[in-house]
Design a protein with these regions (language model features):
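Pre-active-site segment of Zn-dependent metallo-hydrolases
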Residues: 10-39, 129, 134-136, 172-173, ...
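Active-site metal-binding motif and surrounding structural segment of the metallo-beta-lactamase
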Residues: 22-67, 72, 183-189
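Active-site metal-binding loops of divalent metal-dependent hydrolases
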Residues: 17-20, 45, 69-71, 115, ...
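Active-site-proximal loop/helix segment associated with metal-binding centers of metalloenzymes
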Residues: 81-90, 95, 107-158
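Hydrophobic alpha-helical segments and helix pairs
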Residues: 62-106
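Conserved beta-strand hairpin/beta-sheet module of binuclear metal-dependent hydrolase folds
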Residues: 1-30, 146-164
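Cap/insert and terminal regions of metallo-dependent hydrolase folds
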Residues: 45-49, 64, 143-152, 156-219
Length: 219
């Protein structure tokens, strides 16, 4: 998992929250007060990116939470008959109890000038497949998780755009291609997880080559 603090000219944005208390402890060491964070963004509903959110809330984070659709769905990893819960550990009802506002990015949402959330990624690269073990529980049935809840953040810059991703379950190239089509601007840098841990050498080479063709110079 991960947790980034992104500072723009206008705001501080907390992008993902880690799995537990560690990300909040890091914020304390950096003397970052929760009252000084204007936006909280959840890339997707897995525990290692979302599980630390309640800790931030307990310590005073009360800005709106921005996520994709389906962030609170029950997510699991299945291995035969064994299913391991991977979800965020809280839900919409808990948000309401805490008096927190939840805002949905349904494909595109502008946070502020030069800062955007993007989701609903086109699946244009066939070799970027989601492992079958990732599933959701819906109406007492197991359904393959397509990670339609995943979103990324895009920042404008003088030399091009910076894309911040959480885990890239839908495929890093699918994400970047969708971003390029929406904005028609060069992508200068990519920060975050690419989920290539299980990829073979051929897929990694193909991914890097296509990212270079897109103009990405910093990963």
């Amino acid at each position: 998992g991960l947790s980034f603090l992104v500072e723009t000219e206008k705001s501080r944005i907390l992008f993902d929250f880690g799995a537990g208390k560690a990300a909040y402890d890091n914020a304390c060491k950096l003397n970052i007060g929760m009252e000084n964070i204007q936006y909280a963004v959840g890339s997707h509903g897995h525990y290692d990116h979302a599980g630390g959110y309640p800790e931030f809330v307990k310590e005073g984070l009360h800005c709106p939470l921005y996520t994709g659709t389906g962030y609170f769905e029950e997510k699991y990893a299945r291995d035969g008959r064994k299913a391991t819960y991977l979800g965020c550990g809280f839900n919409e009802a808990w948000m309401q109890e805490q008096g927190l506002e939840h805002r949905i990015c349904d494909g595109y949402l502008k946070l502020e000038s030069g800062c955007y959330l993007v989701g609903n990624f086109e699946r244009t690269h066939d070799f970027e497949q989601i492992p079958d073990r990732f599933v959701r529980r819906l109406d007492d049935q197991w359904i393959k998780d397509d990670f339609s809840d995943e979103i990324c953040m895009v920042l404008d810059g003088e030399e091009g755009q910076t894309v911040i991703v959480g885990c890239s379950h839908p495929g890093i190239l699918n994400i970047l291609t969708t971003v390029q089509k929406r904005f028609d601007k060069p992508i200068r840098a990519v920060f975050g997880g690419t989920h290539l841990v299980e990829a073979d050498a051929g897929r990694i080479r193909a991914t890097l080559e296509q990212m270079k063709q897109m103009g990405v110079g910093l990963i």
